[in-house]
Amino acid sequence: MAPFRQDSILIIYPRSQTTLVQFGLNEETFTVPELEIPTQIYRTTRQDGSYTYHSTNKDNKAELIKPIQNGEIIDISAFTQFLRLIFVSILSDRANKNQDAFEAELSNIPLLLITHHSWSQSDLEIITQYVFESLEINNLIQLPASLAATYSMISLQNCCIIDVGTHHTDIIPIVDYAQLDHLVSSIPMGGQSINDSLKKLLPQWDDDQIESLKKSPIFEVLSDDAKKLSSFDFGNENEDEDEGTLNVAEIITSGRDTREVLEERERGQKVKNVKNSDLEFNTFWDEKGNEIKVGKQRFQGCNNLIKNISNRVGLTLDNIDDINKAKAVWENIIIVGGTTSISGFKEALLGQLLKDHLIIEPEEEKSKREEEAKSVLPAATKKKSKFMTNSTAFVPTIEYVQCPTVIKLAKYPDYFPEWKKSGYSEIIFLGAQIVSKQIFTHPKDTFYITREKYNMKGPAALWDVQF
């Protein structure tokens, strides 16, 4: 089969709150998704009991349906209609912009749909049938979100995906490029848990103000070291010489009191050079354009979520039988989800994982082992080693049977400038872009369902090409 046009590839990533959509890939580099829409649709009931679906509630009589909750599809009919809404909207938009679009990018659209681990086999087959028979799309791949995350890292063989959602967090182990379905685990805590904690600290604030604080650049998670160093005073350090130069002429011509100008300038310089963690108070803007002042609460609210995630990760990964695979998984932790864009969140979660699960040789055992190793060395070697430290290569190390002895975050790719600029909280979508380009622009059709395969086997064709 001939490769598809890159500007014809459609990627849809449905989630509980919002859905990310991109139609057409950039020829030169991958970019962040162009559309983020609420995962919802309106439904009205006819007299015969059947339903009709709408994008808006024009007459205020329609029922609002959110077909996905905690990643799981709870209304498959509403979900398929939601997919239709997206597809028809794209067709309409492109056709209005270009009358010849149906002979170009709209002539043959391949769809990559990112799926959640909780979707049942029945859900996946119903979606497949709807895509081919109702939407009349001729080529489809359903890609699990966990595998999309691994491909964003250029195909990690062993890793652990921690996907922090709004109301839940998924922990998904990947071993030998395969999702371990029997070990996939979820906890009923996510970004909303942070809001709930902040609400207790700031009971006078409404929900919108708390959400605005959480999304503001001044909201961050401080490491233990940063908390110790944070003094909350207005020290003014490392000022540039240019910033210390007075413009006397400007002060004179301004007509203002000299002392007032100097005091204002000094305050500005101090605030400019002080870290957020050193300020007793800082301000942010809410969605209504109001400037709001907040204290230490901007560093709080995440601890409980982080501790619970760390605990569940440990319980999950302890069930991996192969010790070598388990070690490799611990060395490639991938943290994704909108909540992880909070400054310091990933680092704090890594710190908690190290604190809770890292296996370190006790100091007494280490000292005893080093002394025993030195005692069996030849005399000549001892003379040579008297100027060496205890960490010389002569002292053997112990390979512990338990794991983890190393816990690390997987290295994010740095050769996608647009993604690097915006952050990697939605890196699952980047993985989908990589996969779609590799598969849909390749002449072989091994990894996706074609119209020919569907006509032969129907929705069951999905299981012959599952990625």
Curated annotation (Swiss-Prot):
InterPro entries: Actin, ATPase_NBD. One of its GO terms (biological process) is chromatin organization. One of its GO terms (cellular component) is nucleus. Changing residue 337 to V: Impaired heterodimerization with ARP7. Coiled coil: none annotated. GO terms for molecular function: structural molecule activity. Pfam families: Actin. It comes from the Eukaryota. It is found in: Nucleus. The keyword Transcription applies. Forms a heterodimer with ARP7. Interacts with LDB7 and NPL6. Component of the two forms of the RSC complex composed of at least either RSC1 or RSC2, and ARP7, ARP9, LDB7, NPL6, RSC3, RSC30, RSC4, RSC58, RSC6, RSC8, RSC9, SFH1, STH1, HTL1 and probably RTT102. The complexes interact with histone and histone variant components of centromeric chromatin. Component of the SWI/SNF global transcription activator complex. Belongs to the actin family. Component of the chromatin structure remodeling complex (RSC), which is involved in transcription regulation and nucleosome positioning. RSC is responsible for the transfer of a histone octamer from a nucleosome core particle to naked DNA. The reaction requires ATP and involves an activated RSC-nucleosome intermediate. Remodeling reaction also involves DNA translocation, DNA twist and conformational change. Present with 1790 molecules/cell in log phase SD medium. This is Actin-like protein ARP9. It comes from Saccharomyces cerevisiae (strain ATCC 204508 / S288c) (Baker's yeast).
